[in-house]
Amino acid sequence: MILQALVQYYEDLLANGKITRPGWTSAKVSWALELDENGQLMALHPLQQEEKRGKKTVLAPCQLQVPEQVKRSSGVAANFLCDNSAYMLGIDGKGKPERAMQCFAAAKELHLAILQNVPGQAAQAVQNFFINWDPKAAEQNPALEQSLKELYKGGNLVFLIRENYVQDDPEIQEAWQRQCDKNTDAPEIRCLVTGQKAPLARLHPAIKGVTGAQSSGASIVSFNADAFCSYGHEQGGNAPVGSYAAFAYAQALNYLLADREHVQRVGDTTIVCWAAGGETAYQQVAMDALFAMDAPVSESDVRNAVDKLVHGQSVEWQNVTLDPQRHFYVLGLAPNAARLSVRFFWQDTFQTLLDNVQKHYDRLEIVRPAYDKFPRLGVYWLLQETVNTNSRSPSAAPQLAGDVLRAILNNTRYPATLLDGVMMRIRAEQKVTRGRAAIIKAYYLRNEDPRCPKEVLTVENNKETNYQPYVMGQLFAVLEAIQMAVNPDINTTIKDRYFNAAASTPATVFPTILMLAQKHMQKMSKPQKIYYDKQIAALAGGKLEGSFPARLTLPEQGAFILGYYHQTQERYTKKVEE
């Protein structure tokens, strides 16, 4: 599935002129020789285009896809369908007519050999041209005499028939492909990617650009030990991929990885994405939606576009109409010595992607401190909430990044390791950040558990719920506020000493911290004391029934942490408003 999608993307890029095909290259072309159906030269057309170079505007050759060109030294070696005037016309203005004739003879031999028995008017016209063209009479040809001076300055020429470049003719392209295939002695196999018969790719091209992999490139498909082989096959014969498919998927993947604007790294995973058809506008919207990246447009514009696409409406984005039903792909790769591991591969419609991502961010939505200016928590920052920043290598667990992204893309349950990592950091640091509270909320909204009910999984403080673990978290925040009100310059609070025990074994802690609160309140002014007395009474007296529980389960601890976070943020919000 991965290789098939990449091969299709390669062909989309090829159709858009963004990438070269096997046996082809992008070359600078200055002139087009227009032939009639009989191979007679009718006209010479300049292909130069105006181009800005600094403050100057100059004429520059255009870029065309042409058959792959040879690497010349000092010998005579002709190119197919695209070459200079010495090879295409037998003239060069360098005062060496004998060498120009040799070049033309080499080009004639090459073209007649490749185009022999090729059907179609284009192939026949080119053959007739080389058979009938007389280099000695070239300078007197009416089609050339007006442009000889410019022609002698150099530049490549191609053939043009009926306003179509000859190298674009399907029958000629097939002939050139057959010529390229002759250069391999690989056995013919049924390609498992295309389903067509093709020469076997014994070794696949290297993939470059994956963070942490070898700089020279790594392989997705490789067999370098007998233990990996079966039925007597060697190397690529164990997974028969044709040379074209191997070239195509590698070209497409290297193209994606080279586009650094649309590559994201999370943990050890390098992520690329693409849309069927090859338009980069889809990648830009998807990357911003998934990773909360800085977009060249406003946050509101991105949200409006995503909202319309989620509801099945097309959107104009950077002069491209985004289709919500367009097939979209996301691939995560991780380094593994000389190979690459596929962390995940996702494919569905663009609408499904954005819908799943939007649901993820909706679950993460939670009240945030006034100083926090980020409306969304990207995947990178979520994973950082599981990291010990004081460690030698502060990075998330390698497998976690792939597991979390897979859950987001598929709108499935979050991995338990995400919650475990967050709870571990809270216990170690006694610090409940916006990110950690948001993860707990999102986790239990998706991974439903009655011990952490939806009534406590709210954006802001829920004053109506009577769920005991959540209310105890609220109460703990109030008791901490009392201590801080009496001792505003205090460095450590009851949170630093008692938070872990209060969240896991409340019966052992709450009697102590309630007694401490009463002592602190004796130092308060009367209005302040009345205010906090009412808060404690509303929570401890009105909602907590009986004694404090001896132990809280992990989901109940999550509810406790959310209660504490919500109540704390409400206190800070009131201070900001005041």
Report the location of each language-model feature:
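Short Cys/His-rich metal-coordination motifs, predominantly Zn2+-binding knuckles/fingers
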Residues: 194-196
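Short catalytic/ligand-binding loop motif for oxyanion handling, primarily in non-cytosolic enzymes
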Residues: 200-202, 339
